[in-house]
């Protein structure tokens, strides 16, 4: 999604893709990990390492965070965020357009009341209960797989190069630890390389981002 935003921006962009154009079993192994707590899909089955990422598994179900998701809650240790839902709104609107849904419909009570044909719904008291009520939308986009939907745009792009089978193994910082100077990449054949750039965007998801950060401990 970040690379899509930068198409035809005039910036020279290199997108590092851990997998290939389509899912490959040997690269999916890199997504393995251990789940703790309630049983859920294995980490390598619920994510895809390929162009388009997890959109290749996506059924189109969407739901934004709510304002109180960012609040500190007495029954959730370490809860509370330094940002609010208002900080994300502009990005939610743009993401909704890309996903083929309407951001405003999440908050349009009239729309959902009409859809319920005379029935009504009541939100749970989320501050004092583990129970929650959420409104979901399902995208009616003809093609939900970004690897297909945006393939032609990337192939014809004049400013973006995509490097496949380029798994980031470490962010290389300067000696002060104040900025990233380069990233180390490798493939499963043992080939290694270093990529330098003026700016880096780490956009690998909620699990792979911290994995890479934790592996980047040469100085700190």
Task: List each model region and its residues.
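Glycine-rich loop(s) and the adjacent beta-strand/alpha-helix scaffold that form part
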Residues: 5-8, 21, 171, 183-220
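Hydrophobic or amphipathic alpha-helical targeting/insertion segments
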Residues: 13-18, 23, 54
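Conserved redox-cofactor binding core of oxidoreductases
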Residues: 74-77, 81-180
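Redox-cofactor-proximal catalytic regions of oxidoreductases
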Residues: 32-106
């Amino acid at each position: 999604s970040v690379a899509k935003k930068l198409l035809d921006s005039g910036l020279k962009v290199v997108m590092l893709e851990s997998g290939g154009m389509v899912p490959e079993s040997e690269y999916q192994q890199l997504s393995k990990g251990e789940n703790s707590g309630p049983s859920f899909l294995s980490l390598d089955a619920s994510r895809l390492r390929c162009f388009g990422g997890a959109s290749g598994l996506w059924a189109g179900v969407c739901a934004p965070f709510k304002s109180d998701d960012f609040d500190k809650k007495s029954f959730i240790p370490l809860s509370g965020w330094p940002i609010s839902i208002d900080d994300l709104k502009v990005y939610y609107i743009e993401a909704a357009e890309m996903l083929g849904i309407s951001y405003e419909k999440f908050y349009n009570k009239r729309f959902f009341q009409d859809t319920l044909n005379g029935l009504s719904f009541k939100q749970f008291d989320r501050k004092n209960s583990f129970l929650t009520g959420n409104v979901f939308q399902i995208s009616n986009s003809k093609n939900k797989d970004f690897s297909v939907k945006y393939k032609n745009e990337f192939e014809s792009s004049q400013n973006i190069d995509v490097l496949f089978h380029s798994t980031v193994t470490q962010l290389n910082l300067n000696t002060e630890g104040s900025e990233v100077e380069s990233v180390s990449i490798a493939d499963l054949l043992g080939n290694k390389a270093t990529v330098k750039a003026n700016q880096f965007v780490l956009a690998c998801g909620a699990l792979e981002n911290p994995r890479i950060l934790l592996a980047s401990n040469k100085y700190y």
